A protein has these predicted regions:
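Short glycine-centered, acidic/aromatic-flanked micro-motifs in structured strand/loop junctions
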Residues: 40-41, 135
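Short Gly/Thr/Asp-enriched flexible loops that form oxyanion-binding sites at enzyme active sites
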Residues: 46-59
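Flexible, glycine/charged-enriched surface loops at secondary-structure junctions
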Residues: 9-13, 41, 120-127
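Residue-level "edge-of-site" marker
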Residues: 16-17, 44, 68, 80
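Short glycine-rich anion-binding loops that position phosphate/pyrophosphate groups of nucleotides
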Residues: 42-48, 98
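Phosphate-binding glycine-rich loops and their immediate beta-loop-alpha structural context
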Residues: 1-39
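Short acidic, glycine/serine/threonine-rich loops at helix termini
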Residues: 23-25, 49-52, 78, 105-106
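Flexible glycine/proline-rich
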Residues: 56-196
Length: 196
C-alpha cells in the first residue's frame, strides 16, 4: 500500500488464507468493484501458491514469470467483471511477489506506469548518470538484474556502491538512491566498470 500510496485507491480486501476457492472468490470480488487487482504473495510455484491458477480459472492468465530479478514470479492476467451474473469489462490482475524487494520492483515496473497512463500523467523518466561500480557483482544469465545502489561523488567521479541483495533485504529499499540494470546476457560486472 505504501508503494502506491500517492495513487488513487478505492479498496482493500482482507488477507486471505492459502485456499484456492477463497482466493478465487476474493479476486473475483475485487474485479467486480475495482479497475485493477493487485494480489500480494502466492505468485511463486509452491504448493500453496494459487494466484496463477485462480486467475487462469477466472479469466485469462497472460504471464506467470518474467525475466527480472528480483521479482521473477510476477503474474499478469485479466478477470472479467461480473455484475448480476453477466461478464463485462476485463479487469487487469497483477500478482505481486510476496518478498518486499520483489514487490517494490514489480510496482515500479508494472503498477506505477499503468496508473500513470490511466491518470494521464507523464511517463516517469529517471535521472541517468554514469558511475563506476565499487565492487564486483555476479549476476545470473537469463534475467535482467535490478541492482540497488548508493550513488555518491568522490574526487569528482560518481561511484555506485551495490547494496546487499535479495528479495527480502528491505534495507536496500530504504538506503538505495539508484538502480543499475544488468542485462540478461551479462553474467556480472567488475569493480570499476562504468554503469548507468
Amino acid at each position: 500500500r505504501d508503494t502506491i500510496g500517492n495513487w488513487s485507491t478505492s479498496g482493500s480486501f482482507a488477507i486471505t488464507i492459502d485456499n484456492f476457492d477463497k482466493i478465487c472468490s476474493q479476486i473475483q470480488a475485487a474485479a467486480n468493484t475495482c479497475d485493477l487487482v493487485l494480489v500480494n504473495a502466492g505468485s511463486s510455484a509452491g504448493s500453496e501458491d494459487f494466484t496463477a491458477a485462480a486467475v487462469e480459472k477466472l479469466g485469462r492468465l497472460l504471464v506467470h514469470g518474467i525475466a527480472v530479478r528480483p521479482g521473477h514470479p510476477v503474474i499478469i492476467g485479466f478477470v472479467p467483471r461480473n455484475s448480476a451474473g453477466v461478464s463485462s469489462k476485463e479487469v487487469p490482475v497483477i500478482g505481486v511477489p510476496g518478498y518486499p524487494v520483489s514487490a517494490a520492483l514489480t510496482s515500479e515496473i508494472f503498477v506505477e506506469p499503468l496508473l500513470r497512463i490511466w491518470q494521464g500523467e507523464p511517463e516517469f523518466l529517471p535521472v541517468i548518470l554514469k558511475a563506476k561500480l565499487t565492487r564486483k557483482i555476479n549476476s545470473p544469465a537469463g534475467d535482467d538484474d535490478f541492482l540497488r545502489v548508493v550513488v555518491g561523488e568522490v574526487n569528482h567521479q560518481w561511484l555506485a556502491a551495490p547494496l546487499s541483495r535479495g528479495a527480502g533485504v528491505t534495507t536496500s529499499l530504504s538506503k538505495a538512491d539508484g538502480i543499475v540494470i544488468i542485462p540478461r546476457n551479462i553474467q556480472g560486472l567488475e569493480a570499476g566498470d562504468t554503469v548507468n
